A protein has these predicted regions:
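Juxta-kinase regulatory segment immediately upstream of eukaryotic protein kinase catalytic domains
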Residues: 1-27
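A glycine-centered beta->alpha junction motif in the catalytic cores
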Residues: 55-57, 115-129, 152, 177-188, ...
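A conserved alpha-helical element in kinase catalytic cores
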Residues: 53-113, 128-129, 134-139, 277
């Protein structure tokens, strides 16, 4: 997040690092990403760390409430550590958290947050929305092929295709008759945007349901998936490509990962829920590596799921009290572009 958390002091996070036996001598907030809060730290032995504090209220895919969110986040971080240590060589592209002295991959920070610590890896980070070159697309597909062939750790959860934020989206669609005044500067514009495109959004929800039924009827095998292997979670270190942010790891069909690579490749359609090219030419490399041909309907399902979930999350953000902050403006702009893209493809 660009903004620091309003309810957490830096001193609280620094104290939490004692569980990792880290004594920071250099400490700086890192205004990156969207959803979690990050700091960089250097300890007395000149080791560098990337410290992440998760807002458990924003981890709805793990279940309702902070306890379910913490349990799900812990399972995801445990899974990342297990993947990194997979025998015989491990998945060296997994940037996994560092366990505490007691073996914990994540620790509670107050009632509604959790902290994890990662090694600060040298490299060039990407950004969400970047276009992958054919070379990068190939390298990422190679990583995903390795990941999808890896045996699932015991901590890996099955992740159904449904999206947990759907009730918030449906609630917003039902509650458009009155102005959303007195909440924040972007609430009422969000309502007006939704009112214009409500029929199209309901149609896309119907399409989503149809594609979920098709996927379940196919009985496709589940594999370990990252969940968000987009350029923003990619670190370039020479010819190596590393994957960050494993909080969405879980068991699903491969297309949960593959659509993002296909859409992010040079010349492919955007990852905004619009129908169009499925990047079949890009995915040939994956098919050759795994022997499994990606299913176009499943690719379309997960593309649509991403967009609908984004709409729900941004609406939830803007229907809560907010000010004209950079993060709120980012949510407003992303909501507008995503809703318009969904409607255009309806």
């Amino acid at each position: 997040m660009e903004e620091r958390p309003a309810d957490i002091e830096d001193s609280e996070v620094r104290r939490a690092l004692k569980a990792w036996r880290i004594d920071p001598v250099a400490w700086e907030y890192a205004p990156v990403g969207f959803g979690d809060y990050h700091w960089t730290a250097t300890d007395t032995r000149e080791r560098r760390w990337f410290v992440t504090v998760a807002d458990l209220a924003d981890k709805s895919w793990y279940g309702d409430g902070p306890e379910a969110a913490f349990s799900g986040l812990r399972d995801a971080m445990d899974t990342a550590v297990a993947l990194r240590g997979t025998e015989p060589d491990g998945l060296d592209f997994v940037v996994a958290p560092v366990p505490t002295a007691e073996g914990e991959t994540v620790r509670a920070l107050g009632a509604g947050h959790a902290v994890s610590v990662f090694p600060l890896v040298s490299g060039t980070p990407g950004h969400f929305g970047d276009t992958l070159t054919p070379h990068d697309s190939g390298l990422v597909l190679d990583l995903l092929a390795r990941l999808h062939r890896t045996a699932a750790p015991a901590s890996a959860r099955v992740l159904p295709p449904d999206f947990a934020t759907r009730p918030q989206l449906e609630s917003a669609l039902r509650e458009m008759s009155r102005p959303w005044d007195g909440i924040g500067p972007y609430a009422e514009p969000a309502r007006q945007l939704l009112a214009v495109h409500a029929d199209a959004l309901r149609g896309r929800l119907d399409e989503f349901d149809r594609r979920v039924r098709e996927l379940r009827a196919s009985d496709a095998p589940l594999v370990v998936t990252h969940g968000e292997p987009h350029p923003g979670n990619l670190l370039r270190a020479g010819e190596r490509r590393l994957l960050l942010d494993w909080d969405t790891v879980g068991l699903a069909v491969p297309e949960r990962d593959l659509w993002l690579v296909a859409d992010g490749a040079d010349g492919a359609e955007g990852a905004d829920g619009a129908s169009g090219a499925d990047g079949a030419d890009v995915l040939v490399r994956y098919e050759e590596a795994t022997g499994r041909k990606p299913d176009p309907s499943a690719l379309a399902l997960y593309r649509l799921r991403w967009a609908l979930n984004d709409v729900a999350e941004f609406l939830t953000w803007l229907r809560a009290p907010h000010g004209p902050t950079p993060d709120a403006r980012q949510a407003r702009d992303a909501l507008t572009s995503t809703v318009e893209s969904l409607a255009a493809a309806a």
